[in-house]
Every structure is written in structure tokens, then in C-alpha cells.
From Swiss-Prot:
Entry protein name: Methylthioribose-1-phosphate isomerase
SUPFAM superfamilies referenced in this protein's UniProt entry, alphabetically: NagB/RpiA/CoA transferase-like
GO biological process: L-methionine salvage from methylthioadenosine
Reaction equations catalysed: 5-(methylsulfanyl)-alpha-D-ribose 1-phosphate = 5-(methylsulfanyl)-D-ribulose 1-phosphate
Chain positions recorded as substrate binding sites: R51, G52, A53, R94, Q199, N250, K251
Family: Belongs to the eIF-2B alpha/beta/delta subunits family. MtnA subfamily.
GO molecular function: S-methyl-5-thioribose-1-phosphate isomerase activity
Alphabetically ordered keywords of this record: Amino-acid biosynthesis, Isomerase, Methionine biosynthesis
Gene that this polypeptide is encoded by: mtnA
Species whose genome carries this gene: Geobacillus sp. (strain WCH70)
Length: 356
């Protein structure tokens, strides 16, 4: 049996550079890239070399810290202005993932009261490292809460990749499957391929197989038949942004799975950290939806599969209405139904815990 957690980390800090697992090359090639400046970091995020909301946040935090180390000035005011400009630059790399803004803003806030440039540089590194350490703990706790919703032998459908390589470790939607493996429970995962970038086919199946988790790959248009024929007991997905009312932006195709779950009468779960919940965004209507390069649809592995000049609509995300979501699973617990009241309460609980 494979070691359940023998899974490559997606991001590492190495003092003079950031090392990332190039998720664009998986599963055929396991390639690690060295990001040596802020432009490398921006490109890695925008080009999906690193992806998954928490991993994006971690990488951006390290990118901000790295750029700060490379900026030479004795003026603390000029240094902070440089950090703020870098923050805005990195924030432009992916407009939907709220973890990106959360991590960058956390680093900017961490140097609000420093007294020197050297102190600011050290603080930024420590804060970025802290974000990664905290995310690993958060993901494990999400997995423990999620696992309480499953029984031995359950067959669970997921989309995209909300796994270990999308986070610091364990993942969000995939975390319960690693913990089930650890505890000797048998859960079978059905992974939707996730067109057009194929994160489910390339990434989810790859990392689950590395850990010896039972996984079956399906194409996106097989979901309804799979739920019916394979007796799927639940759907679990990650999230890139959750609005205050529970509306959830996630990889394109998630909304369709939620509709299918409702039609078949099975639970539809969203697993995400508190940092993905954006209380300033009241509903899903306010969430910007990134539209990506048409070639992601018209080409596969560099080969054109559609006529030259065809019109293409390529949204990277869709928004699942809150009334289709059975529960939102966070590190602080499971929220069901009354999201406008219960989601803010999670943050109040977090604030009380930090004050103790």
C-alpha cells in the first residue's frame, strides 16, 4: 500500500527563490520550476503552473516576500509603497481566487508597524511561511470534518483538483480521502476530467493514485450516467470564492454537478477554508468570472480540434447558488443552510479563539 501522504508539495520557499511543482506538465512529466522574481511568480499563477486557491495564495505571498528581499532602499516609506505596488501587480494574475487577495493583504498588514526595512523584510518572509504552515493544518481539519459525513464504501464524485497540490497539503475536497486511507476506510472517488484544462484527469487522478486512493476517471458529460449507474452517494468540490450568502464560485462545471446532485437527491458539499469566504461579496452575482484563452478550448496538447476562427466562450468558473449546496465544510466546522447568518459566525468564532 502506498504511503497516504507521499505526495509532492506544490510550493516551497528556498531563501533566494520559490520552487513550485509545474502542474501544467502533469501527469506526463514531474517538473519543478524555480521562480526567481515577481514576474516569474505572476506568470506561474496566470499560466496555471501553480493553481488551486490556497496554493495560489501561498505562492503569491512568497512572491511578495521575494520581491521585497530584492528591493534596496533605506526608506521604510518607499519600501512599503513598493510592497503595495507589488501586491496590486500579483493580485492581477487571477481575479477570481479570493485567497490570492487574502494572502497578499495579510502580508501588507504584517508590516504596518515595523520600524525598519530589514525588520519588514524578515516579517514578510515569516508571515508567508506562517500562511503555508497554517494552511496544512486547516486542510487536515477540513478533511476531518468532511470525513464525518461519509461512510465506509461511499462513492463520491468530484471535479477539478482541490487536492494536496492545490494547497499546502491534503487539499480541501480531497482531504477526506487521504484521511480515510489513513484510517482504513474505503471511499471510492470518481474524478470528472474537467475540460478544458483537464485538472481532474491530469491532477486529481495523479495525486490520488500516488497515495493509493481508489479513483475512477470519467469525462464531464458522463456525470449523470455515473451518478445513476455507479450509485454515487455524494458530490464534494472545492471553492475559489464563497459569497456571504453561500453562493460559491468554483471550476466551470461545478454548477452542473450541483444541479445533478439535486436531481438525484444526493448531498452536494463544498469544502473550503475560511480564507475563501468573502463576506464583502454579498452574492455570487458580484463575483468576477475569469474568461481564459480560446485556445484552451480549440486545442488539446497543442493540436487544434476545432475549425479556425470559430467563436469560443471559455469561462474558467461558474457560480453555484447557495440553495443547491447541502453544506459548506470549513476548518471551523460544517455549516448547513442559513449561510448568511452562519458564515459570519464562523469568523466570530475564529476571532474569539485568537483572542484567548
Amino acid at each position: 500500500m502506498a504511503e497516504p501522504f507521499a505526495i509532492p508539495r506544490s510550493v516551497e520557499w528556498n531563501d533566494t527563490h520559490i520552487t513550485i511543482l509545474n502542474q501544467q506538465k502533469l501527469p506526463l512529466v514531474t517538473e519543478y520550476l524555480e521562480l526567481k522574481n515577481i514576474e516569474d511568480v505572476w506568470d506561474a499563477i496566470a499560466a496555471l503552473k501553480v493553481r488551486g486557491a490556497p496554493a495560489i495564495g501561498i505562492t503569491a505571498a512568497y512572491g511578495l516576500a521575494l520581491s521585497a528581499q530584492q528591493y534596496e532602499t533605506e526608506s521604510l516609506e518607499k519600501f512599503k509603497e513598493h510592497v503595495r505596488k507589488d501586491r496590486d501587480y500579483l493580485a492581477s494574475s487571477r481575479p477570481t481566487a479570493v485567497n490570492l487577495f487574502w494572502a497578499l493583504d495579510r502580508l501588507v498588514s504584517s508590516i504596518a508597524h515595523v520600524s525598519s526595512v530589514n525588520e519588514a523584510k524578515t516579517t514578510l518572509i515569516h508571515e508567508a511561511i506562517r500562511i503555508q504552515i497554517e494552511d496544512e493544518d486547516v486542510c487536515r481539519r477540513i478533511g476531518e470534518h468532511a470525513l464525518s459525513l461519509f461512510q465506509n464504501g461511499d462513492r463520491v464524485l468530484t471535479i477539478c483538483n482541490a487536492g494536496s497540490i492545490a494547497t499546502a497539503r491534503y487539499g480541501t475536497a480531497l482531504a477526506p480521502f487521504y484521511l480515510a486511507k489513513e484510517k482504513g476506510m474505503n471511499l471510492h472517488v470518481y474524478a470528472s476530467e474537467t475540460r478544458p484544462v483537464l485538472q481532474g484527469a491530469r491532477l486529481t487522478t495523479w495525486e490520488l493514485m500516488q497515495a493509493g486512493v481508489d479513483v475512477t476517471l470519467i469525462t464531464d458529460n458522463m456525470a449523470a450516467q455515473t451518478i445513476k449507474a455507479k450509485n454515487i452517494t455524494a458530490v464534494i468540490v472545492g471553492a475559489d470564492r464563497i459569497a456571504a450568502n453561500g453562493d460559491t464560485a468554483n471550476k466551470i462545471g461545478t454548477f452542473g454537478l450541483a444541479l445533478l446532485a439535486k436531481a438525484f437527491g444526493i448531498p452536494f458539499y463544498v469544502a473550503a477554508p475560511l480564507s475563501t469566504i468573502d463576506l464583502a461579496t454579498k452574492t455570487g452575482e458580484e463575483i468576477p468570472i475569469e474568461e481564459r484563452n480560446p485556445e484552451e478550448v480549440t486545442h488539446i496538447a497543442g493540436t487544434r480540434i476545432a475549425p479556425e476562427g470559430v467563436n469560443v466562450y471559455n469561462p474558467a468558473f461558474d457560480v453555484t447558488p447557495h440553495d443547491l449546496i447541502t453544506a459548506i465544510i470549513t476548518e471551523k466546522g460544517i455549516v448547513r443552510g442559513n449561510y448568511e447568518t452562519e458564515l459570519p459566525a464562523l469568523f466570530a468564532k475564529e476571532a474569539r479563539h485568537e483572542a484567548i
